[in-house]
Amino acid sequence: MKHSNRLTRREEYSRVLASGGTYIGQLAVMKAVPNSLELSRVGFIVSKKVGGAVERNRAKRILRESLRTTGLKQGWDIVFIARAKAATVKCAEMERVVKHLLGKAQILSKANEKTSSKAD
């Protein structure tokens, strides 16, 4: 994931968490808010409830990979908060959950909306 597509500063995370819409899934919670940029930026929060450092990093890698294969509409700041089971699932399961959350928020790009509706 490119540096320009990531949320990096505390203020960016705080803005999304405070004013973003909340979408709840089995493996993750997503908060999203429109931004005024030509691109979408994504951040990840994985607490110690998920497990030790190895499990937390695995959960982030799975979330990142799920987003890499999923197209997003431009102009959104998105934060994914991993739930405790996130480190134990296969990438395909996480991808299904991520597509479902993005579809609920209407952030999924047009090309991926059709494949998301078939998965649910």
Curated annotation (Swiss-Prot):
EC class of the enzyme, as a word: hydrolase
Alphabetized Pfam families for the sequence: Ribonuclease_P
Family annotation (InterPro entries): Ribosomal_Su5_D2-typ_SF, Ribsml_uS5_D2-typ_fold_subgr, RNase_P, RNase_P_CS
Keywords: Endonuclease, Hydrolase, Nuclease, RNA-binding, tRNA processing
Gene name as annotated: rnpA
Enzyme Commission number(s) from the entry: 3.1.26.5
Record keyword RNA-binding present: yes
Stated family: Belongs to the RnpA family.
Complex formation: Consists of a catalytic RNA component (M1 or rnpB) and a protein subunit.
A GO CC term assigned to this protein in UniProt: ribonuclease P complex
Reactions the enzyme catalyzes: Endonucleolytic cleavage of RNA, removing 5'-extranucleotides from tRNA precursor
UniProt superkingdom: Bacteria
GO terms, molecular function: 3'-tRNA processing endoribonuclease activity; ribonuclease P activity; tRNA binding
Summary of the function given for this chain in its UniProt record: RNaseP catalyzes the removal of the 5'-leader sequence from pre-tRNA to produce the mature 5'-terminus. It can also cleave other RNA substrates such as 4.5S RNA. The protein component plays an auxiliary but essential role in vivo by binding to the 5'-leader sequence and broadening the substrate specificity of the ribozyme.
Any one GO BP annotation for this protein: tRNA 5'-leader removal
Name the record gives this protein: Ribonuclease P protein component
